[in-house]
Amino acid sequence: MKRVLLVCLSLMAFCLSARSQPVRKPVYDVAAYLYPAYAADDPRLRPFWPSGIGEWETVLTMQQRNPGHYWDRKPLWGPVNEADPAVMEKEIDQAADHGINVFIFDWYWYDGRPFMETTLTNGFLKAPNRSRMQFYLMWANHDVVNVWDTRISTLPEHNVIWTGKIDRDEFEKICLRNIELFFKQPEYYKIDGKPVFMIYDVKNFIEGLGGVKQAAAAVRWFRRQVRKAGFPGLELQFTMWGPNLNYSGFDAGKTDRPREALVRKIGFNSSSHYQFAHFIPMDDEYPHIVDQAVAEWERIDHDFTLPYYPHISIGWDNSPRIVKSPRVRNNTPENFEAALRRARAWVDAHPGLHPLITVNSWNEWTETSYLQPDNVYGYGYLEALKRVFVDEP
C-alpha cells in the first residue's frame, strides 16, 4: 500500500513539474535587408545625391520635384546619418526590441573598391550595442544605371555607370577582404557555423567570371579560403528572382530540376528573395500579392531540393526615383502582420529548415518598402513584427 501511495505521489509530482515548465517559445531569425545609402560621410555618394545626405535627398525633395504628387512620406526619426554609430545604436535597439535579430546589409563593390560601405563599417560595427544584432552581406552586384540620380532617372536611356561584373582576380580580392573584415566578426550570421553570403545577380556573377564552369571554380576557391580561416564551410545563398534561371542554354540539360542543376553546379547552398517586385506584378492589392508569394514558395519547394527561406516584402512604389511606378495597394500594417504569420507558419511546417525569414526592408524608402516609422503608419510595421515574433508564444 505504501509503495502504491509513493508511486502515486511521484506521478503527481512529475505531472505538476511538467505542467509548471514553460512552453519553449520557437526561435526565428528575422532578417531585414538594410540599404546603406542613407549616409552622410561617404563622398562616393555625392555624384548621385550632391546635398551630402545620401538618398534622403530623393525622399525629402519628392514634392519639390513633383508638386502635388501623391507620394509624400517623411521619416519620424528624421533624415538620420546611418553611418553614425550613435544613430545605429538607436536603430539596433528599435529593430531588436521589435523582433529583428539580423540585418542583411546590401553590399556593393564597384570600380575596384567598396561603395556605400560606411553604414556598416562606421555605423553598425562601431555601435556600442552591436552585439544585439547579427548581420550578413548580400552582394548587390547589379549594374549601376541612371535610377539613383533623379536629375536623369526619367530619361529614356540605359547608361551603365558601373558594371557589377567582376573577374576572378577581383573576386578573390573581395572574398579575402570580406573574410577578414566581416566574417570574423562575432556578430556575423552563420548557419551551422558557416558564414552566410548572398549573391544578388547570378547572371552578372557568371558573366563576370567567364561562364558557369569558371564561376563554379571561383566558388570552390572561396570555400577553401573560408575553411582556411577556421570556419566549417560557407553558406552561399543566391537571390531568387522569377521562375526562370536559364543561363546560356544550361537549363536544356536532361534533368527534372534544370534550375537547381544550374545553381548546384555553381555551388550555391540556399536562396531567398529580395523583393516581391522581382517576381510578382506590383500594381495590385497586397493580400493578393502575398497569396502569389506563398504559391511561389511552394513552387520553389517543389522545384528545388536546396533550402529556400521565405520572404516578405512590405510594399513597392519606386516613384520617388522615377515619378511613375506600379504601386502596391492596401499594404497596411495589419495586412503585413498577416503576411508575417504566413511566413512563420511556412517555417513551422518545414522543421528541417533553419528558421530564417527575410524581410524587405529596414529602410528602402525610395522603393516604399521600409519598417522604419513614418508619417503615414507611424510604428505600425514594427509593431506588427513585434506582435508576431516577440509578444506571442
Predicted regions and their residues:
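Bacterial N-terminal signal peptides
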Residues: 6-15
